[in-house]
Structures are given as structure tokens and as C-alpha cells.
């Protein structure tokens, strides 16, 4: 259906876009037809429509329905496309949904290369985030892909960058910000909605949010897995300090949402301890990386 157009001009599309979706854990069933569609879109001489995949009820939270419903590893299949041919957005706050999606849709409408949009959302009924407390107070910040929740406090030693992705993971990082500040921990906290959107931002903005040097001084807190971090090119020690749903390389069990999040180590206490360890070890982390580089020039 999305391959059909009523336009006689091959450069213009006059047809419909389509959407299909299910639990994030089951969306791999849709991967093969979506991949074939992406290949067709790439090679078509005519403008075509855009396929939407809704990976709903994604993340560890859905284990409340049973182990079969975990949307942790499964949604990683949506990274298996040539870069630039899909836009994947992972949303955690209600106010991120509209700007994040419409930014992706605007790009897809203008760029014939983009044939698929993947929308990943979780189920929990979290309170709407108070953006007056964020460093980036823009209500449409999600359109930029990555945005700053907390910036470094000027005049104090910096302890690194924390990149968040997913619902419970980001909500619980926000919950411990005041506690981190009371403990003297000065980290920059970034919400990662979509690396695909972030890649399309001006270089000045990208450098202001996540400069290249920050990649080797970062950890991430994600409701996904350690195999697929929120952004690429992170440093060699990032995995050692990051928190993900597969932190112990085991399939998780199931239970109440609170129990599931605690087992995944994405509860506020686990997040606070991990960020504190990351901050406390900063000098040691940087020294270890310096020693690795030094071995290359000996």
C-alpha cells in the first residue's frame, strides 16, 4: 500500500503512510517485511510512503505480564538497518512524544531515503516531567534527538556524563538528581531520544550537548541492553560503569513492576550507587584510558 502513489511525478508522493505495531517483545516478527520494504524504498525510482513500527509496551516494565513479554533484547532488531534509512525514537515522557515523532515525520517527508520510522514506548503511567527543572527547558527538545536534563555546575569539578534512555531508567535518574547534588556529584545528564535525530542537528548543537571528548568520560542508564548503547563510539570503559536491564547477562524473571525494575537494577537506589561509583572513579577511569593510549606510542 505504501509503495503505491497517485502522482505522475516520480519525485512526489501522493498516497498513504502505514503503521503496524505490537508489544516491543514481539516486533521482531515485523522485522523481515520491514527490511524488505526498506530495500525496495532505497532502490525505487519513485517516491514512496513511510512505514511506521510501534514497539509498544517496551522495556523491562512489561515483564509484569510475564517473561515472554520483556521488550529488552527484541527491539534491538530495529537498529539493523543502514544508517540514515530509518529513524528510531525511544520516548520516556509524554511531552516528548509529539515533538519527537513530528521531527521524524518531517524528515521522512522530505528525505526519500528514510522509509521506516520506529516508535518505541513503554507502558508505565509516570507523572509528566517538570521541565522547569531541566537545563534544556524547551518543551520540544525531543525533536533534537538528545537534550540536556542537567548540565555541569560551573566552578566545580566535573565527574562525567550520564546518558539516559528508556522510561523507568530516565524517570529514576531524574528522581536522584537532588540526592546526587547533595552528595557533591557533578555530572551532566542527557536524555537520548533518538541518535538518528541527533545526527541531523547542527554541529554546534551536537558539540554543546555531547562533545567528542565526553564519549570517553560517559556511562549510560538504559532500559535496553549493554549490547546496544544509546549512542555510538563510547569509550572502552563505558560498559563497566553503565546500567542496563541485562546488567548480569541473565534473562530476568517477572513480577510486579517495582520488583522487575529492582531486579533490572534500574531503581533509584541502584542508579544512585552506580552514578556515585562512576563519579568517585573518574580519576582512575581517565588514568586507565591514558595508560592504554600510552602503550600505542611506546
Predicted features along the sequence, with ranges:
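A short, small-residue-rich loop immediately preceding and capping a beta-strand
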Residues: 10-26, 51-54
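Conserved phosphate/anionic-ligand binding catalytic regions in large, soluble enzymes, centered on
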Residues: 1-7
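Phosphate-handling active-site elements
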Residues: 8-15, 43-45, 183
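Long mid-to-C-terminal assembly/interaction modules of large eukaryotic proteins
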Residues: 30-32, 65-66
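Patatin-like phospholipase A catalytic core
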Residues: 11-13, 29-30, 214, 247-248
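Thiamine diphosphate
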Residues: 55-75, 83-88, 96-100, 105-298
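Intrinsic-disorder/low-complexity recognition with aromatic hotspots
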Residues: 27-28, 37
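A glycine-rich helix N-cap at a beta->alpha junction
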Residues: 38-57
Amino acid at each position: 500500500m505504501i509503495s503505491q502513489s497517485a502522482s505522475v511525478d516520480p519525485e512526489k508522493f501522493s498516497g498513504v503512510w502505514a503503521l503496524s505495531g505490537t508489544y516491543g517483545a514481539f516486533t521482531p516478527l515485523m522485522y523481515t517485511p520491514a527490511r524488505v520494504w526498506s530495500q525496495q524504498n532505497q532502490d525505487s525510482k519513485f517516491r514512496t510512503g513511510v512505514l511506521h513500527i510501534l514497539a509498544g509496551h517496551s522495556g523491562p516494565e512489561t515483564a509484569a505480564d510475564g517473561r515472554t513479554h520483556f521488550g529488552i533484547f527484541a527491539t534491538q532488531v530495529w537498529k539493523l538497518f543502514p544508517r540514515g534509512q530509518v529513524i528510531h525514537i525511544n520516548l520516556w515522557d509524554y511531552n516528548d512524544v509529539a515533538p519527537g515523532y513530528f521531527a521524524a515525520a518531517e524528515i521522512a517527508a522530505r528525505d526519500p531515503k528514510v522509509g521506516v520510522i520506529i516508535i518505541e514506548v513503554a507502558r508505565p503511567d509516570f507523572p509528566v516531567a517538570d521541565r522547569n527543572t531541566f537545563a534544556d527547558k524547551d518543551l520540544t527538545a525531543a525533536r533534537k534527538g538528545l537534550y540536556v536534563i542537567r548540565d555541569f555546575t560551573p566552578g566545580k569539578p566535573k565527574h562525567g556524563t550520564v546518558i539516559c534512555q528508556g522510561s523507568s531508567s530516565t524517570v529514576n535518574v531524574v528522581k536522584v538528581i537532588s540526592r546526587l547534588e547533595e552528595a557533591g556529584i557533578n555530572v551532566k545528564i542527557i536524555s537520548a531520544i533518538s541518535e538518528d535525530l541527533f545526527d541531523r542537528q547542527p554541529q554546534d548543537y551536537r558539540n554543546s550537548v555531547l562533545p567528542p571528548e565526553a564519549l570517553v568520560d560517559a556511562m549510560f542508564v538504559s532500559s535496553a541492553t549493554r549490547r546496544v548503547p544509546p549512542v555510538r563510539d563510547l569509550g572502552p570503559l563505558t560498559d563497566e560503569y553503565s546500567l542496563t536491564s541485562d546488567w548480569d547477562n541473565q534473562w530476568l524473571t517477572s513480577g510486579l513492576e517495582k520488583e522487575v525494575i529492582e531486579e533490572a537494577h534500574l531503581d533509584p537506589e541502584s542508579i544512585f550507587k552506580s552514578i556515585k561509583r562512576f563519579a568517585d572513579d573518574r580519576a582512575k577511569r581517565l588514568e586507565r584510558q591514558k595508560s592504554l593510549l600510552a602503550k600505542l606510542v611506546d
